[in-house]
Amino acid sequence: MTTIRVKENEPFDVALRRFKRTIEKLGLLTDLRAREFYEKPTAERKRKKAAAVKRNYKRIRAMQLPKKMY
């Protein structure tokens, strides 16, 4: 569980921003959204495989030399 200690004379907005930052760093919101609905194991594997292919394609495109523009 994440706890944030509010310092003396600290505005609420600053404390809320610190809380949101720690939640984001821990990845709790992404995990919560992923577990919101049941996903069949085959659908999960298919989604992860597609993401890996997309990442690989993006990495290859970044390594290629740009085409000459003339």
Curated annotation (Swiss-Prot):
Keywords: Ribonucleoprotein, Ribosomal protein. PROSITE patterns: RIBOSOMAL_S21. It comes from the Bacteria. GO terms for molecular function: structural constituent of ribosome. GO terms for cellular component: ribonucleoprotein complex; ribosome. GO terms for biological process: translation. InterPro entries: Ribosomal_bS21 (IPR001911), Ribosomal_bS21_CS (IPR018278), Ribosomal_bS21_sf (IPR038380). Belongs to the bacterial ribosomal protein bS21 family. NCBIfam families: S21p (TIGR00030). This is Small ribosomal subunit protein bS21. It comes from Albidiferax ferrireducens (strain ATCC BAA-621 / DSM 15236 / T118) (Rhodoferax ferrireducens). The gene is rpsU.
